[in-house]
């Protein structure tokens, strides 16, 4: 396997619409238990639940239509997103370390063979390694922000980039 293809529990669970739905349900349940007489949270939760369900459906449909099987990203921040939508995340760095020359060569060779068109990186990490790989395989490098305050917009944009031809 390629470097960084293993799941890492510490990665950004909130990048997955499915996980966001679970997080929202758990938060709502905790609030409801803490304030059992309050009904004002229910309407907000129901709106959020509906929005997240639509995001989940939209994400799944885009990925299914695209035929994409995996994507390359500098830091493995999309582990739960990949897991929940049947994708494989190939991370350039592993455990906070730059790849070895051998690992980098393997990523480049596989990306060339598969015709990878985009490599993703987060603005919290250096883009230099991503730029080198992208140039080498004639792909574009795309910035994503898994910490964006607009999680729904960020997930939509990320999905569009991952599934674009």
What is the meaning of each model-derived region?
Residues 5-165:
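Extracytoplasmic metal-acquisition and chelation regions
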